[in-house]
A protein has these predicted regions:
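Residue-level detector of anion-binding/catalytic polar loops
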Residues: 35, 108, 185
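Alpha-helical substrate-recognition element adjacent to the catalytic core
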Residues: 31-61, 67, 93
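Conserved SAM-binding loop
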Residues: 7, 14, 91, 109-112, ...
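Active-site neighborhood of HAD-like aspartate-dependent phosphohydrolases
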Residues: 1-44
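An amphipathic alpha-helix signature
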Residues: 22, 26, 47, 51-55, ...
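Asp-based, Mg2+/Mn2+-dependent phosphohydrolase catalytic module
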Residues: 1-4, 40, 103, 117, ...
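Short, acidic loop-to-helix structural element flanking the phosphoryl-transfer center
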Residues: 2, 82-111, 117-121, 146-149
Length: 231
């Protein structure tokens, strides 16, 4: 039987990347005289990759942007972000212990993120946790991205897992909608990057710390999704 798999979102779920994303975004905005984004506003911008972050920052100030300028600013963003990696980004409290718990229990682990694949791999490598994941799949890995359920399903398959024995962990409506569309149970963390409470999006369960993400919970969610009796 295929090993069960747990799939994580990256920004705002596994790793607190907000300070560095904000720094790179504001670096780009300064070059074109667009007002900077305040730290308290970052949750409105994260979730769909650097390109969308830039578009949203322009839209917030009624500033139009064409594809040529957007391409140039995204290139600048990536250069700035990569040069400072990992910067202030760190795994959220309890992440390392949770990864070890699930590894010891025989789970495969993978990452499904709307961050570009290369940036995702570089970040996790810089944090020395990349080898814990059988697959690290970004917005450009397959040609479709969250909330398209194929992004999650293809990540699971690339990691050697089975969508029928999978659970996802994320922090946003995008993650929750993706998992639901794929028919996969989803654990939502309430400390991530969303401007609305994750409870509103009706995930399978909400946790406030990775200590709550137990192997027993993962197995229970997988069995429940498969229609099996849960003790």
């Amino acid at each position: 039987m295929t090993s069960p798999i747990i799939v994580f979102d990256l920004d705002g779920t596994l790793v607190d990347t907000a300070p560095d994303l904000l720094d790179s975004l504001n670096h780009c905005l300064r070059t074109v005289c667009v007002p900077e984004v305040a730290p308290v506003e970052i949750r409105r911008y994260v979730g769909f990759g650097s390109r969308v972050m830039i578009e949203r920052a322009f839209a917030a100030h009624g500033r139009p942007i064409d594809n040529e300028e957007l391409d140039a600013l995204q290139k600048l963003f990536i250069e700035h972000y990569t040069a400072g990696m990992p910067g202030l980004s760190r795994p959220f409290p309890g992440v390392m212990d949770a990864l070890e718990r699930f590894r010891s229990a025989g789970f495969i682990a993978a990452v499904c993120t709307n961050k570009l694949e290369d940036l995702s791999k570089r970040l996790l490598e810089a944090l020395q946790i990349d080898e814990r994941f059988a697959a690290i799949c970004g917005a450009d890995t397959f040609g479709h991205r969250k909330p398209d359920p194929r992004h999650l399903i293809d990540t699971i398959k690339l990691a050697g897992g089975d969508p029928d024995r999978a659970v996802m962990v994320g922090d946003s409506r995008t993650d929750i909608d993706t998992a639901k569309a794929a028919g996969i149970p989803v654990v939502a963390v309430d400390f991530g990057y969303t401007d609305r409470p994750v409870q509103e999006f009706e995930p399978s369960i909400v946790i406030s710390h990775f200590d709550e993400l137990t192997v027993e919970l993962g197995n229970k969610l997988i069995k429940s999704a498969a229609g099996q009796a849960v003790a």
